[in-house]
Amino acid sequence: MGLLAVMLAGVHRRCEERLARMTAIAQASQLALLPPLPPQITGISIAARYRSATPGASVGGDLYEIIPTGNGIRVIIGDVRGKGLDAILLARQVLSAFRRSAVATPALEHVAGEVSLAIRPYLGEEDFVTAVLVQIAPGGELTVVNCGHHPPLLHHGGGLRTLTGSTAAPPLGLEDDFTAFTASWLPGDRLLLYTDGLVESRNQHGDFLPEDHIATALLAADCDQALDALLAAVHRHTGGHGHDDIALLLLEHGADPRTAAPADTPDTERRPDAPDRKGTVR
């Protein structure tokens, strides 16, 4: 019995050590996919939040990054299908490719194409990555490329506007030809980027989170308070029983003249082969 007890104690200790190593790896991986962001860049206030569906759950494939470039501030938020190590590794490839292309490539739709091409060798048979890429130009105009992701929400004048182009695009990794569209970006506007855990949050009756709950939360005094209010609204709606991770990015247009939008900026859409074609944003 004494020998058996010693053996069992050894097995227990090794399991605890393995769990501790896996926890450390998960925490380091989450930090790599969801890096700390500065509170402000050239007059744009920034806040970010990540909430796992369940405490201690496997780190999923939610990711985000913000990079100042010569073409403006470039942002990505994305969601890799699945959880665990495979999702983490694929998400890291997405961020690595975005960081390279965001700095070196002039057109945002080409950045999306380069990221899509770069991650293709790492995709499994059923893998995919949805993402939204946003560029905030020095003049304040927004450029958006949506790769199969939930569309950004523009909070303006107390209401929400969904930013969508006229054509749907597939997730990253499936093709390399993407469409960009533009939208105006005015002082005081807030842009919310998010993963599906937000809009797919359901209550006990199966109802999704109402849009007016999001709009109300975004009225808070600053971006950090707004995201805290939004997560609190999700918690109340779901009773604390969310079924998916939530990553949130909120950017607010400040009064810095470098980010002031020109008056009457038209909404347009472009593809690499049709740079002047008009489009719509709803």
Predicted features, each with a name:
Residues 87-97, 101, 168, 185-240, ...:
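Active-site-proximal, acidic helix/loop segment immediately C-terminal to a metal-coordinating Asp/Glu
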Residues 1-20:
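Transmembrane alpha-helices and immediately adjacent membrane-cytoplasm interface residues
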